[in-house]
């Protein structure tokens, strides 16, 4: 449904006043007639280019219809649908990202739509608000660290389609890891603009593709330009003098894979390509708050490395000390309860079982980066799934001893007293003392000194070997799985210290040094009913 006003501005204003006066007298605001009156106001203000009021009435109509407040017969169903989508069109044209996504896919079956099946969780995770704030000039940098195949690149493509539609005379520059990736971006933007399955031509009826090149990866809307509406470049080759970023700099997966992430020289080259041929193509523009700023950046990313392009961009922003206009959204595949963060509606997304299966199948380092949003440097990793020892079943014999080791933050005396009292109350015979662990070595050095013991390597100085449960025996045991993840993710590189979870490897080193290793100043438990502790 399109709004047609052929009158002068003064006549339109008079019509608006008359309609407004009539609506103030309406008692029942749950009728089609009332909605049609609001729709008339929406169209009138849009004709006058009073977009604030147009959006106000469009939003009111959307709320009324979607809430189910308006009652109508089936014969009016199409009419109300037309009114509703026209309101989404109005908001989309003024930069409302969610309205644009809904309006674009209005004619698609819900099970084929991208946005609505994913909307609930994308909004919960702050992704949609982050994109909206970028559109509204509230952010200079938005980073989306999200697992594979949850729709992050499609979000970026819809964002490009919207901004290019709103500002066809300005330039959007997009970069990806290889030519193959930017080929897909180029093809999909053309698809969003031209395919009748989408409603782009209804939202932006005056926009047409007038020039494009699959070889040079550019698209121009409405007129040919030196700096194209859309330009796509590979980060490996960089840009040229004919590229510019005025409305948006879009960076999607600048690091191709873990092999590239593990090569410091290639990462350094990528970063210099980014700073020298991509980032330096940004120009200033007037923002909505009246301030001139360089165009914003969005990085859609897999956080492969502490030293990849996006991680360094974020580190630079943090070092400058002003994060008010920077937002990093990192959502792992699991929530705090171990459930999937991306089990979308209508059968979309992935459940917990899928991610658990991937966790077992994937290399822990790769899984950590791709699915847990934790950059882990393979160079410097000490422990991995293949260099520690495992057991399936405990020996049938009685254990020589059962020990527990706690590395407490605030000193051991108080905690050991409580433990001793509790065990004595339960009639256990035990000998427990506290002792300050050696502090003359850094945590990193303690762990490295015990690395052979943790791996289960027999040495002349020890009389024990350390074994862990087989990986398939700890499925569902969140604490054990987290402990092993921390062990395999521990990195000895100096740069990684204080940036990683090292409690488990440090506690193992403490147990080996202070209990198993024969530090005689530390007490040993002589008789414990292990069953009471679930051991």
Task: Go through each PLM region and give its residues.
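Conserved RecA-like ASCE ATPase "motif II neighborhood" in helicase/translocase motors
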Residues: 213-277
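Signature of the SF2 helicase/ATPase Hel1-core->accessory helical subdomain module
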Residues: 248-337
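C-terminal nuclease/phosphodiesterase catalytic domains that cleave nucleic-acid phosphodiester bonds
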Residues: 414-535
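Walker A/P-loop
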Residues: 139-159
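Pre-P-loop entry segment of helicase/translocase ATPase cores
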Residues: 2-141
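ATPase catalytic-site recognition across NTP-hydrolyzing enzymes
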Residues: 338-406
């Amino acid at each position: 449904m399109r709004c047609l006003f052929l009158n002068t501005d003064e006549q339109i204003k008079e019509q608006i006043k008359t309609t407004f006066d009539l609506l103030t007298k309406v008692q029942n605001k749950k009728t089609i007639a009332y909605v049609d009156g609001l729709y008339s106001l929406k169209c009138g203000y849009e004709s006058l280019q009073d977009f604030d009021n147009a959006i106000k009435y469009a939003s009111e109509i959307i709320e009324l219809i979607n809430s189910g407040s308006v009652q109508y017969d089936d014969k009016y169903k199409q009419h109300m649908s037309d009114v509703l989508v026209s309101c989404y069109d109005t908001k989309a044209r003024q930069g409302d990202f969610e309205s644009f996504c809904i309006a674009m896919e209005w004619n698609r079956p819900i099970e084929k739509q991208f946005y609505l099946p994913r909307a609930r969780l994308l909004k919960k995770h702050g992704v949609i608000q982050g994109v909206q704030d970028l559109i509204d000039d509230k952010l200079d940098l938005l980073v989306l660290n999200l697992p594979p195949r949850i729709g992050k690149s499609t979000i970026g493509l819809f964002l490009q389609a919207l901004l290019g539609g709103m500002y066809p005379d300005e330039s959007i520059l997009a970069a990806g890891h290889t030519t193959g990736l930017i080929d897909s971006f180029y093809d999909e933007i053309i698809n969003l603009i031209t395919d009748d399955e989408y409603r782009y031509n209804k939202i932006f009826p005056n926009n047409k593709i007038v020039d494009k090149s699959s070889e040079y990866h550019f698209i121009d809307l409405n007129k040919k330009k030196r700096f194209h509406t859309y330009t796509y470049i590979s980060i490996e080759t960089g840009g040229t003098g004919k590229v510019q970023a005025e409305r948006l700099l879009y960076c999607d997966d600048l690091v191709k894979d873990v092999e590239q992430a593990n090569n410091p020289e290639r990462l350094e080259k990528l970063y210099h390509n980014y700073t020298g041929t991509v980032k330096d193509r940004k120009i200033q523009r007037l923002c909505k708050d009246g301030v001139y700023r360089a165009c914003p950046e969005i990085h859609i990313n897999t956080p492969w490395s502490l030293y990849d392009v996006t991680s360094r961009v974020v580190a630079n922003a943090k070092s400058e000390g002003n994060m008010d206009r920077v937002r990093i959204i990192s959502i792992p595949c699991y929530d705090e309860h171990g459930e999937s963060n991306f089990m979308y509606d209508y059968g979309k997304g992935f459940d917990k079982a899928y991610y658990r299966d991937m966790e077992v199948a994937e290399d822990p380092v790769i899984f950590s980066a791709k699915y847990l949003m934790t950059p882990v440097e393979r160079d410097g990793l000490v422990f991995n799934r293949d260099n520690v020892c495992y057991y399936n079943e405990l020996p049938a014999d009685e254990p020589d001893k059962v020990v527990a080791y706690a590395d407490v933050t605030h000193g051991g005396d108080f905690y050991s007293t409580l433990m001793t009292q509790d065990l004595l109350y339960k009639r256990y015979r035990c000998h427990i003392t506290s002792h300050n662990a050696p502090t003359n070595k850094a945590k990193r050095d303690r762990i490295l000194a015990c690395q052979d013991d943790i791996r289960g390597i027999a040495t002349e100085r020890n009389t024990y070997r350390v074994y862990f449960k087989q990986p398939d025996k700890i499925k569902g045991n969140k604490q054990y799985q987290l402990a092993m993840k921390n062990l395999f993710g521990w990195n000895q590189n100096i740069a990684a210290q204080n940036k990683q979870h090292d409690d488990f490897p440090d506690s193992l080193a403490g147990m080996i040094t202070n209990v198993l290793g024969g530090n005689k100043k530390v007490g040993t438990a002589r008789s414990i009913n292990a069953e009471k502790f679930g051991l």
